[in-house]
Amino acid sequence: MNPTLALTEDLIRRRSVTPADEGCQAILETRLKAIGFDCEALVSGPDDFRVTNLWAVKRGTQGKDGKLLVFAGHTDVVPTGPLEQWHSDPFAPTHRDGKLYGRGAADMKTSIAGFVVAVEEFVKAHPAHAGSIGFLITSDEEGPAHDGTIKVVEALSARGERLDYCVIGEPTSVNALGDMVKNGRRGSLSGKLTVKGIQCHIAYPHLGRNPIHDAAPALAELAAEVWDAGNEYFPPTSWQMSNIHGGTGATNVIPGHVTIDFNFRFSTASTPEGLKARVHAILDRHSLDYTLDWTLGGEPFLTPRGELSEALSSAIKAETGFDTELSTTGGTSDGRFIARICPQVIEFGPPNASIHKIDEHVEVRFIEPLKNVYRGVLERLIA
């Protein structure tokens, strides 16, 4: 069997729902140690949410003076959803119609397998490679991400480790392998707004104050606000409400408060501080009695065209024929953490149409070319 496909299937068999790793990283560590990597496990998190992280590095002939290319990814997967809706066991890799089915097939165990086999081939072909190679793997990307990649980044930063390039194996392709890569991601800023009123009988509104009515004009203004125009790399910043909770459940009671959850997906044209200030200004203008708690999920990051993007684009062109599109669309990724210690971060992986869905899959015809692209990046940057 093709070694990349075989490793992908082995990883899919592991029921590694966040934060469980279920031995995936042990498989990777064994293979990486066999080709000269130094491997370090970093376990963190509370007892009921233990996260497994792996940092592995193989120095090139230039030592720490040479460039360091890191492959980053996650072994954890999202829950399966209703098992009865799957056409096969999500943790038993299954082939149908030229596709490999299983939870994590697209997001992102195929990419991790491609990383490993590409590096094995590269090291065999270039035993005296000049630059260094690293792996940063976590079991907490699909979850809260408090004890995953960010903890490894903090540890590496504390010891002065410098990363020059990072390829994250997120499933970035759309219709075919290589048609899109991500050279940045928007930031995420969430707010929990509680507007206070005075509870009373709905027939006597003059005896209370309806917080839903109070909040509505301000929410309408927030929804209509143009936060920025975006720029050549990012679309305009968006503000969206996700949840509104108010009332006691009774139809004859004006509630005492209403809570609204909202989220910004923001570009490099805005800052968290600036967005917060503008929200508070709008709320204050409406004279609301409110509290507002903020959570910064991640800053935006951007890798302009440079050595990594050119190497990846060239490798994709050579393998697939595509002139790949650089994009910053989609949700957040662990790139938001890695960008703190690495100036060039790009994501590339298989098509993403089935990720997080019932019957997640990857087309088998894309597996070997994916590995070849990763090897092509190694050849172009650190051989």
UniProtKB/Swiss-Prot annotation:
Details of cofactor binding: Binds 2 Zn(2+) or Co(2+) ions per subunit.
Catalytic activity line of the entry: N-succinyl-(2S,6S)-2,6-diaminopimelate + H2O = (2S,6S)-2,6-diaminopimelate + succinate
Disulfide bridge map: none
Pfam families, A to Z: M20_dimer, Peptidase_M20
GO biological process terms on file: diaminopimelate biosynthetic process; L-arginine biosynthetic process; lysine biosynthetic process via diaminopimelate
Entry EC no(s): 3.5.1.18
Top enzyme class: hydrolase
UniProt subunit comment: Homodimer.
UniProt name for this protein: Succinyl-diaminopimelate desuccinylase
Organism (species): Cupriavidus taiwanensis (strain DSM 17343 / BCRC 17206 / CCUG 44338 / CIP 107171 / LMG 19424 / R1) (Ralstonia taiwanensis (strain LMG 19424))
Taxonomic lineage: Bacteria, Pseudomonadati, Pseudomonadota, Betaproteobacteria, Burkholderiales
Designated gene of the protein: dapE
